[in-house]
Protein backbone atom coordinates (compact mmCIF):
# COMPACT_ATOMS: atom_id res chain seq x y z
CA UNK A 1 0.00 0.00 0.00
CA UNK A 2 2.78 2.43 0.89
CA UNK A 3 4.68 1.57 -2.29
CA UNK A 4 1.54 2.18 -4.35
CA UNK A 5 0.88 5.59 -2.76
CA UNK A 6 4.48 6.72 -3.25
CA UNK A 7 4.55 5.47 -6.84
CA UNK A 8 1.32 7.18 -7.90
CA UNK A 9 1.55 10.42 -5.96
CA UNK A 10 5.26 11.12 -5.53
CA UNK A 11 7.29 9.38 -8.20
CA UNK A 12 4.87 9.70 -11.11
CA UNK A 13 3.86 13.10 -9.77
CA UNK A 14 7.45 14.28 -10.09
CA UNK A 15 7.32 13.91 -13.89
CA UNK A 16 5.96 16.75 -16.04
CA UNK A 17 2.76 15.57 -17.78
CA UNK A 18 3.54 17.15 -21.16
CA UNK A 19 7.29 16.93 -21.72
CA UNK A 20 10.29 15.40 -20.02
CA UNK A 21 11.07 17.47 -16.95
CA UNK A 22 11.25 16.35 -13.34
CA UNK A 23 10.96 18.17 -10.04
CA UNK A 24 13.30 17.90 -7.09
CA UNK A 25 11.44 19.88 -4.41
CA UNK A 26 7.94 18.46 -4.01
CA UNK A 27 6.11 21.10 -1.98
CA UNK A 28 2.67 20.21 -0.64
CA UNK A 29 1.73 23.38 1.23
CA UNK A 30 -1.05 25.82 0.43
CA UNK A 31 -0.68 27.26 -3.09
CA UNK A 32 2.52 25.29 -3.60
CA UNK A 33 3.83 24.64 -7.10
CA UNK A 34 6.39 22.28 -8.60
CA UNK A 35 9.68 23.79 -9.81
CA UNK A 36 10.43 21.80 -12.96
CA UNK A 37 14.06 21.28 -13.83
CA UNK A 38 16.71 19.14 -15.56
CA UNK A 39 16.76 21.11 -18.80
CA UNK A 40 20.52 20.72 -18.47
CA UNK A 41 22.51 18.08 -16.52
CA UNK A 42 23.67 20.77 -14.10
CA UNK A 43 20.21 22.03 -13.20
CA UNK A 44 19.42 19.39 -10.57
CA UNK A 45 20.50 15.91 -9.59
CA UNK A 46 17.10 14.66 -10.70
CA UNK A 47 18.25 14.92 -14.27
CA UNK A 48 20.02 11.66 -13.48
CA UNK A 49 18.70 9.98 -10.37
CA UNK A 50 15.16 11.26 -10.84
CA UNK A 51 15.09 9.83 -14.34
CA UNK A 52 15.79 6.36 -13.01
CA UNK A 53 12.51 6.36 -11.08
CA UNK A 54 10.44 6.25 -14.23
CA UNK A 55 11.79 2.96 -15.55
CA UNK A 56 11.18 1.14 -12.27
CA UNK A 57 7.40 1.32 -11.95
CA UNK A 58 7.13 -2.45 -12.32
CA UNK A 59 9.76 -3.46 -9.76
CA UNK A 60 7.26 -4.39 -7.02
CA UNK A 61 4.47 -5.57 -9.32
CA UNK A 62 5.19 -9.29 -8.79
CA UNK A 63 7.00 -11.56 -6.38
CA UNK A 64 7.39 -15.32 -6.70
CA UNK A 65 8.30 -18.37 -4.65
CA UNK A 66 8.72 -21.95 -5.80
CA UNK A 67 4.99 -22.52 -6.20
CA UNK A 68 3.24 -19.14 -5.87
CA UNK A 69 3.11 -15.68 -7.38
CA UNK A 70 2.10 -12.47 -5.57
CA UNK A 71 0.49 -9.65 -7.55
CA UNK A 72 1.51 -6.53 -5.63
CA UNK A 73 0.58 -3.74 -8.05
CA UNK A 74 -2.27 -3.40 -10.51
CA UNK A 75 -0.53 -1.79 -13.47
CA UNK A 76 -0.15 -2.77 -17.15
CA UNK A 77 2.76 -5.21 -17.07
CA UNK A 78 4.13 -8.44 -18.50
CA UNK A 79 5.77 -10.96 -16.17
CA UNK A 80 7.93 -13.72 -17.61
CA UNK A 81 8.22 -16.39 -14.96
CA UNK A 82 11.19 -18.35 -16.25
CA UNK A 83 11.08 -21.07 -13.60
CA UNK A 84 7.53 -21.99 -14.63
CA UNK A 85 7.98 -21.08 -18.31
CA UNK A 86 4.85 -18.98 -18.02
CA UNK A 87 4.08 -15.46 -19.26
CA UNK A 88 1.51 -13.40 -17.38
CA UNK A 89 0.08 -10.16 -18.75
CA UNK A 90 -1.87 -7.59 -16.79
CA UNK A 91 -4.12 -5.14 -18.64
CA UNK A 92 -5.86 -2.21 -17.00
CA UNK A 93 -6.37 1.51 -16.95
CA UNK A 94 -3.91 3.12 -14.61
CA UNK A 95 -4.74 3.84 -11.79
CA UNK A 96 -7.03 0.85 -11.83
CA UNK A 97 -10.36 0.00 -10.26
CA UNK A 98 -10.38 -3.13 -12.42
CA UNK A 99 -7.52 -5.22 -13.74
CA UNK A 100 -7.41 -8.26 -16.02
CA UNK A 101 -4.62 -10.80 -15.58
CA UNK A 102 -4.08 -13.38 -18.31
CA UNK A 103 -1.83 -16.37 -18.76
CA UNK A 104 -0.66 -15.68 -22.31
CA UNK A 105 2.01 -18.34 -22.70
CA UNK A 106 2.87 -21.67 -21.12
CA UNK A 107 1.31 -23.92 -18.50
CA UNK A 108 2.13 -24.42 -14.85
CA UNK A 109 0.88 -25.35 -11.42
CA UNK A 110 1.02 -22.60 -8.80
CA UNK A 111 -1.03 -20.43 -6.44
CA UNK A 112 -1.80 -16.78 -7.18
CA UNK A 113 -1.99 -14.21 -4.38
CA UNK A 114 -3.75 -10.95 -5.19
CA UNK A 115 -3.27 -7.85 -3.05
CA UNK A 116 -6.34 -6.32 -1.42
CA UNK A 117 -5.52 -2.59 -1.10
CA UNK A 118 -6.13 -0.87 2.22
CA UNK A 119 -8.63 1.45 0.51
CA UNK A 120 -10.78 -1.41 -0.88
CA UNK A 121 -13.40 -1.17 1.86
CA UNK A 122 -16.55 -0.95 -0.27
CA UNK A 123 -16.24 -4.01 -2.41
CA UNK A 124 -13.54 -6.31 -3.74
CA UNK A 125 -14.05 -9.20 -6.10
CA UNK A 126 -11.96 -11.70 -8.00
CA UNK A 127 -13.26 -13.63 -10.98
CA UNK A 128 -11.50 -16.67 -12.36
CA UNK A 129 -12.63 -17.39 -15.91
CA UNK A 130 -15.79 -15.37 -15.26
CA UNK A 131 -16.71 -16.97 -11.92
CA UNK A 132 -16.51 -14.95 -8.69
CA UNK A 133 -14.26 -16.63 -6.13
CA UNK A 134 -13.63 -13.92 -3.50
CA UNK A 135 -15.98 -15.16 -0.79
CA UNK A 136 -14.29 -12.93 1.79
CA UNK A 137 -11.50 -10.40 1.82
CA UNK A 138 -9.56 -8.23 4.23
CA UNK A 139 -8.00 -4.89 3.20
CA UNK A 140 -4.21 -4.79 3.67
CA UNK A 141 -3.94 -8.48 2.88
CA UNK A 142 -3.98 -10.93 -0.01
CA UNK A 143 -6.65 -13.18 -1.47
CA UNK A 144 -5.22 -16.51 -2.58
CA UNK A 145 -6.30 -18.56 -5.56
CA UNK A 146 -5.16 -22.00 -4.37
CA UNK A 147 -2.52 -23.93 -6.25
CA UNK A 148 -3.96 -25.13 -9.54
CA UNK A 149 -2.98 -25.92 -13.10
CA UNK A 150 -2.88 -22.75 -15.19
CA UNK A 151 -2.97 -22.56 -18.98
CA UNK A 152 -2.95 -19.87 -21.64
CA UNK A 153 -6.76 -19.65 -21.59
CA UNK A 154 -7.09 -18.64 -17.94
CA UNK A 155 -8.22 -15.09 -17.08
CA UNK A 156 -8.37 -13.45 -13.65
CA UNK A 157 -10.36 -10.25 -13.13
CA UNK A 158 -9.84 -8.04 -10.08
CA UNK A 159 -12.55 -5.49 -9.24
CA UNK A 160 -11.84 -2.91 -6.51
CA UNK A 161 -13.87 0.35 -6.48
CA UNK A 162 -12.00 3.42 -5.26
CA UNK A 163 -13.14 4.85 -1.92
CA UNK A 164 -12.82 8.33 -0.41
CA UNK A 165 -10.96 8.48 2.89
CA UNK A 166 -8.44 10.53 4.84
CA UNK A 167 -4.90 9.23 5.23
CA UNK A 168 -3.36 10.66 8.40
CA UNK A 169 0.31 11.18 9.14
CA UNK A 170 2.65 13.17 11.41
CA UNK A 171 3.45 16.76 10.50
CA UNK A 172 6.51 18.94 11.18
CA UNK A 173 8.82 15.94 11.19
CA UNK A 174 11.97 18.05 11.32
CA UNK A 175 10.79 19.46 14.65
CA UNK A 176 9.56 16.13 15.95
CA UNK A 177 12.99 14.65 15.31
CA UNK A 178 14.58 17.08 17.76
CA UNK A 179 11.81 16.89 20.35
CA UNK A 180 11.91 20.69 20.68
CA UNK A 181 9.97 23.52 19.11
CA UNK A 182 10.81 27.20 18.71
CA UNK A 183 9.99 27.96 22.36
CA UNK A 184 12.45 25.28 23.49
CA UNK A 185 9.72 23.24 25.15
CA UNK A 186 8.84 19.59 24.71
CA UNK A 187 7.29 19.13 21.31
CA UNK A 188 3.76 17.76 20.98
CA UNK A 189 3.41 15.73 17.76
CA UNK A 190 1.16 17.26 15.13
CA UNK A 191 -0.99 15.33 12.69
CA UNK A 192 -2.22 16.17 9.24
CA UNK A 193 -4.43 14.36 6.77
CA UNK A 194 -4.64 13.90 3.01
CA UNK A 195 -7.93 13.39 1.22
CA UNK A 196 -7.54 10.22 -0.82
CA UNK A 197 -9.56 8.64 -3.62
CA UNK A 198 -8.40 5.07 -3.71
CA UNK A 199 -4.59 5.35 -3.83
CA UNK A 200 -4.65 8.91 -5.19
CA UNK A 201 -3.99 12.05 -3.14
CA UNK A 202 -6.49 14.77 -4.03
CA UNK A 203 -5.74 18.47 -4.37
CA UNK A 204 -7.94 21.55 -4.38
CA UNK A 205 -7.75 24.77 -6.37
CA UNK A 206 -8.90 28.31 -5.69
CA UNK A 207 -8.29 28.30 -1.92
CA UNK A 208 -6.06 31.03 -0.48
CA UNK A 209 -6.39 30.13 3.21
CA UNK A 210 -6.84 26.87 5.12
CA UNK A 211 -9.81 28.30 7.04
CA UNK A 212 -11.74 28.61 3.79
CA UNK A 213 -11.36 24.97 2.88
CA UNK A 214 -14.52 22.88 3.17
CA UNK A 215 -14.26 19.11 3.08
CA UNK A 216 -17.28 17.01 2.26
CA UNK A 217 -16.82 13.29 1.82
Where are these regions (language model features)?
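A structural signal for short secondary-structure junctions
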Residues: 92-96, 104-108, 117-119, 137-139, ...
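Beta-strand-rich interaction surfaces with strong enrichment in secreted/lumenal proteins
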Residues: 88-91, 101, 134, 144-148
Amino acid sequence: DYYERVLYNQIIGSLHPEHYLTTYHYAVGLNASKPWGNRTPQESCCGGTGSENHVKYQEAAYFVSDDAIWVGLYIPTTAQWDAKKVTIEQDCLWPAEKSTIKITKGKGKFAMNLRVPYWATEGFDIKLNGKSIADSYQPCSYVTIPKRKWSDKDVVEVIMPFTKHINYGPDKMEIAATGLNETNTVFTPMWTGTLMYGPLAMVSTGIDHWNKAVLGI
